[in-house]
Amino acid sequence: MTLQRSGVGWKHVAGLGVSLVIAGQFTGWNYGLASGWANMAIATLLVALLSFGLALCVAELAAARPHAGGLYTYCQDAFGRFTGYMVGMTVFGALAIGTGAAATFISAYCEHVLGFGGFPLKLALIAVIIGVHLRGVGEAMNLLVAAGVISVLAIILVLATLAPHFSPANLLTPELPLEISPLGVFSAIPFAIWLFITVEQTTAASEEVDDPGKNIPRGMIAAVMILLVSALCILLFAVGAGGITHLAAADDPLYAALTSPLLSKSYATVATIVGLGGMFGLLATMFSLAYSASRQLYALAREGHLPKVISRVNRLGAPDLTLMLVGGIAVFASLAPPMSILLAVVLSLSASYIVVLAAFIRLRTVEPDMPRPFRAWGGRGTAAACLVLSVLVFAACFQLDIAMLAGVGAYFIFAIAARLFSRRTEAAPAAAVKETPANV
């Protein structure tokens, strides 16, 4: 059972990478402003370096071994099946619940801009997105890229509108002076990473990409550069025009910047357009998260970590059972507080980064002659630096609430139990065959 190659090129890969992340540029990042603008800016540059280096490393691995399992495949190659499985389940859980959180944010934007939302809208969004993915990767990718382009245009509109109103004085308040402190940077990191997180999950498309040795690296590098430029401009112009106090606690910081009392005139129409753009951005991220999560679980089942039936594909080459499982998890996640979900995603994915970067270093060491159509710039040095940054991100997440940490721990226990159950059910028929009289 294999996935179809469907004419997916580097532009689709770049679109997938941007779409996976773009919602984080509309919401979530601004909570880091509570640590002060300078500390948030430094935290953003640190996680940008992490994201770029990580993208180079996983692009090398994906080009060498295109696989729908993405990160877990490389961890399995380096450290064995159990480690690979746990990384795969960690990534799957983060992406699946992130799909539900994206539905929650879309509902919130829709209620604010259009006047309706709630659970029925979340349910409809999840059903439509899973339905489109069931039609095959080609149609899903085209819609995903279109939604991503619309959301990027919305951000450009925000920046063009706010840039003339920029004032350095708006970047600070008496309570939040323009001072730099290690603790302030550390506190801002879990929020700064929302400007880039999950871009590395584009490797899930490598099995369906034409010429992955060329298109995966080119697409991933393009995605990170687009996101970096966008993130820095948002941090400078949105905060510098709307004011740090006004944006720090807003659920919709770009919309809040356009309606800030600090602006010399009203931009109500532009704010409405940007609100709609934010919905498209979240929709693009929701598409991307559902895509990557379904491929992750499909690959785990196909490799025998989970029951084989989960790796079934429909007549259009889409993994239908994994998509429906992602949809079910997303429905339940959409009922949870979104910030708790988002912070659980950061903790889980940063843990997977640590393992995959260690896997990159190990594979460079023990398999130096493995064919590598693309080689990461800086090699093991880049991976080691990113490994240190990943540990920093992971440690920063432990300033968060106990309930979220307990939930992540419970999920890991479930993942181990699921693998043990799968191994027992697959071993039982084999044992039964050995005990039949005909085989004695």
Predicted regions: what they are:
Residues Y31-A34, G53-I126, I130-L134, M279-A299, ...:
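Hydrophobic transmembrane alpha-helices that form the core helical bundles
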Residues L3, M40-A41, F116-G117, A146-G275:
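Helix-loop-helix junctions that connect adjacent transmembrane segments
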Residues T73-Q76, G80, E111-V113, G219-L289, ...:
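TM-loop-TM module centered on a large, flexible mid-protein loop between adjacent transmembrane helices
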